[in-house]
Amino acid sequence: MPAAPKIPFPLSTAPGGNPIEGAGRLINCSAEPIADGRSVRHRQPGLTTFAVTGQTGYRGSLLVNNALFVAFNGRLVKVDAAGVVSDIGALAGTKKVEMARNNLVPTCQVAIVTENGAFLTDASGAAPVAWPDADLPFPNSVCFQDGYFFFGIGDRRVFATGINSSSVDPLCFTTAESKSQDALIRVVAHKGLLFVFTTAGCEVWSDTANPAPGFPYSRLAVLDRGLIAPTALAGWEEGFGNLLWVGDDCGVYRLGAGLQPDKVSPPDLDRLLQKQAKIDPT
């Protein structure tokens, strides 16, 4: 009886442009090279249930001290370390949110940006309210660094609050001006720098302690690759070291040496992202 043919399992996702070209995809497992050119594949068991909120439509979350603040369709809830769920209050909207916290003592503030504007709550779980300072224009993203909340505005402006405060000086802003026909879609704090992503590039700003009411940061570098969608970004969170994002050309990039974007995606993955971008560009 002839021996069964060996099945060549892939080492990464390689579906090919057409099924006949593909080498396969790894789903719920990962490949690891070992000695003598061999490799081993480990099963990835997935996740276990930690808490049940009774809500639907996950929109985003943020760890605040020892509790997880989670936004769902129309609501904001808090999950403590024991998995106990508490309702915080209404948070209108269904789209993804951006959240950040500051270091205000004794109770830090939490900023939330939704499709309906900016909202403010705090670590105690106070019901979210519309941003209390009317000098803040309508933002599309928020992050925190060096004591400041930074808010990104679609017209390429970035506003900074006071130190560990919700106050906004109408003069404390800067504008991403390296490109002329792009739109700002995300601000991210990473490794002591502020990354201002637009649809056509990215500006990197550093803290130069510019005096008030001026913007406290100054531009350090400009990256050639923009961001395809506000949520197409990872690695900036605490516990991660490398910034990864899907660029405006549907390629995946990693922040490399000299603040330059290094492309890390193979052509197969680029094609998958291009197809997805046609279906849902967000």
Regions found by a protein language model. Name each.
Residues 44, 50-52, 90-94, 127-136:
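Short linear interaction motifs
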Residues 185-282:
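Beta-sheet-dominated scaffold domains
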Residues 54-62, 92-105, 134-146, 182-186, ...:
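Repeated scaffold domains used in trafficking and secretory/extracellular systems
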Residues 75, 117-119, 201, 251:
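A short loop-to-beta-strand structural motif that recurs across blades of beta-propeller domains
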Residues 79-112:
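A broadly used, surface-exposed interaction patch
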Residues 83-87, 125-129, 165-172, 210-218, ...:
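Beta-strand initiation motifs
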Residues 1-85, 138-199, 203-210:
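N-terminal beta-propeller domains
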